[in-house]
């Protein structure tokens, strides 16, 4: 498992020092979003796009946080991730770590930190982006999957039914094809203007997930788009071309693929699941 990187706390410590100095000098409230965003941009962070699962956000890149089992870009304005990306291997699906169910503020998030109580009484689930079920191979990976930076307000029925069905299907594909690369996150398209909790976590309009199967036996890029509402529909009804999702999200998925290969896979409209 040499590919797994220990989380690098350099950016977290650097940000903490910047915030501490700035607060001492000015005494201003550094939880304000525009100030937080300025600090994030000042770090000049870059995600490792040589890794197959890492996307490129064309505008407004968030705070990059590297975890044991996934990487995310955190949106300080909406208090949710922009995207969460990870590789899931056949071996990792055989893990037996138990869920902790201990939702915690993310210690590396710059600025205001979402807490589990922001979701209390909201009517929304604490919806994992990188699922706990994909992190059973490591105690640390499991614990980190419960950081609130990996969570979005999600319709209960969607979280427990169709979204969960796709998580299980992804593990099935990882076992069948050796590994899969996954990116997912919320979609904000202006359809609703709803916030929850004292930290004003913005409720997504929808969610996307893209899955790359890049095996000698099978190669496919699957795009899924879920409205943030009850569904209970076949997963095939959520399929959408990856090209369409790139336009919706402003992201470039799987940029590590050769251009010709990437273009061919992403423009394909898949009508059925592998």
PLM features per residue range, with description:
Residues 2-274:
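Domain-level detector for secreted/extracellular nuclease and nuclease-toxin modules, and
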